[in-house]
Amino acid sequence: MYQVLLFIYVVVAIALIGFILVQQGKGANAGASFGGGASGTMFGSAGAGNFLTRTSAILATAFFVIALVLGNMNSHKGNVQKGTFDDLSQAAEQVQQQAAPAKDNKNSDIPQ
């Protein structure tokens, strides 16, 4: 269930990005290169803006709802397994107990 919602979440995010990029801007008319500014488009002169605005609003709502559901599902996972890094104090104690004292090496080249 989590993987299906995650897949839908990614698809909605990509679709939302696409619909926002295709919309006609106020100044630059970036959407006109994709047919958003022409009057003879598939949706008519005013229909494309209305369709793109509604679809973007629906996709944005779905994006936030799915994000909340995924966050809720992720926070309520009951079977949390103990990981390797959960209890590092035991490993530190073992390392301290196994440490050997340093030998005095009189023939060493390192000054003391």
From Swiss-Prot:
A GO term from the CC aspect: plasma membrane
| Location (main, coarse) | membrane
Biased composition regions of type Basic and acidic residues, renumbered to the chain: 103-112
Q: Does the keyword Membrane apply?
A: yes
A single GO molecular-function term is: protein-transporting ATPase activity
Q: Which GO biological process entries does UniProt record here?
A: intracellular protein transmembrane transport; protein secretion; protein transport by the Sec complex
Pfam families in the record, alphabetically? SecG
Which residue intervals are annotated with compositional bias (Low complexity) in the record?
92-102
Instruction: Please state where this protein is localized.
Output: Cell inner membrane
What InterPro entries does this protein's entry cite?
SecG
Keyword annotations for this protein? Cell inner membrane, Cell membrane, Membrane, Protein transport, Translocation, Transmembrane, Transmembrane helix, Transport
Q: Where are the transmembrane segments?
A: 2-22, 51-71
UniProt topology in membrane: Multi-pass membrane protein
Q: Where is this region: Disordered?
A: 92-112
Q: What does this protein do?
A: Involved in protein export. Participates in an early event of protein translocation.
Q: Which PANTHER family match?
A: PROTEIN-EXPORT MEMBRANE PROTEIN SECG
State the similarity comment: Belongs to the SecG family.
Q: Kindly provide the name given to this protein in its UniProt entry.
A: Protein-export membrane protein SecG
| Natural source organism | Haemophilus influenzae (strain ATCC 51907 / DSM 11121 / KW20 / Rd)
What gene, per UniProt, encodes this protein? Answer: secG
